[in-house]
């Protein structure tokens, strides 16, 4: 009887199964909303508030400007990372992660911070901005310095200097070899470009390397036969440097 779609009992069982599925989905969503690794948006805001961490403003909006300037808030990924650093900020000994947390909390315009100690009692904190090529303004450096040198945040024995990270701009000249027979070359190239941006944007950090293998792997989207990077040399920034892709070009070679 249940094999018949017209059987009322079959419809009743399907309805009950669907209701159960919705219930389990709701339970799963509520569960992940209480996990830092998976919580998003307002759920993440409420979760990290338990650690006295709040979402920062990256760019102040101005509706009176022409054109209007939108308000840009800290991303979920950045807030999640900073919230995890908050535990290190509880230390009064001045560990590296505590300096990173305080520097990034000073202003939402700080994308990354890297502290180093060139000599005993001296701490250099390099700052990378979230806007432009990453070079911080003098105002941003001053704001971070004032925040970091507060006696309630850093050890009195530390002499803190806030400096701008050195930005290493680079360009990418990419050749994608795509078979003539197959999906649209434009579709394949668009997917390769999307995958490229997914790997170069997160690597816009202080001291993070940009190797050839990473780029080629990302560009090998389905349908790409071969990838060539013209005149490429791996970029290995020091602890005070950050790589930044200023421009990239993608050439299609249909074969």
Give the positions of each predicted feature:
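N-terminal polar alpha-helical/low-complexity "assembly arms" that mediate subunit docking
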Residues: 1-92, 185-255
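Carbohydrate-recognition loop of C-type lectin domains
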Residues: 88-208
């Amino acid at each position: 009887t249940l094999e018949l779609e017209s059987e009322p009992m079959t419809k009743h069982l399907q309805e009950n199964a669907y209701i159960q599925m919705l219930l389990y989905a709701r339970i799963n969503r509520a569960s992940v909303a209480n996990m830092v690794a998976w919580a998003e948006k307002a759920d993440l805001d409420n979760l990290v508030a338990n650690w006295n961490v709040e979402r920062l403003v990256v760019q102040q909006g101005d509706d009176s400007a022409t054109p209007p300037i939108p308000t840009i808030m800290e991303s979920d990924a950045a807030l999640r990372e900073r919230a995890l650093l908050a535990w290190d900020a509880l230390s009064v000994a001045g560990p590296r992660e505590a300096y990173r947390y305080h520097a990034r909390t000073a202003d939402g315009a700080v994308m990354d911070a890297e502290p180093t100690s060139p000599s005993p009692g001296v701490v250099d904190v390099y700052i990378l901005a979230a806007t432009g090529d990453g070079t911080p303004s003098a105002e941003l450096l001053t704001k971070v310095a004032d925040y970091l040198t507060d006696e309630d945040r850093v050890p009195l024995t530390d002499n803190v200097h806030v400096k701008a990270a050195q930005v290493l701009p680079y360009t990418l000249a990419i050749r994608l070899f795509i078979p003539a027979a197959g999906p649209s070359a434009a579709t394949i190239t668009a997917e390769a470009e999307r995958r490229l941006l997914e790997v170069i944007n997160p690597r816009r950090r202080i001291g993070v390397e940009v190797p050839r293998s990473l780029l080629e792997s990302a560009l090998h989207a389905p349908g790409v036969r071969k990838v060539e990077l013209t005149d490429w040399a791996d970029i290995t920034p020091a602890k005070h440097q950050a790589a930044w892709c200023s421009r990239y070009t993608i050439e299609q070679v249909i074969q």
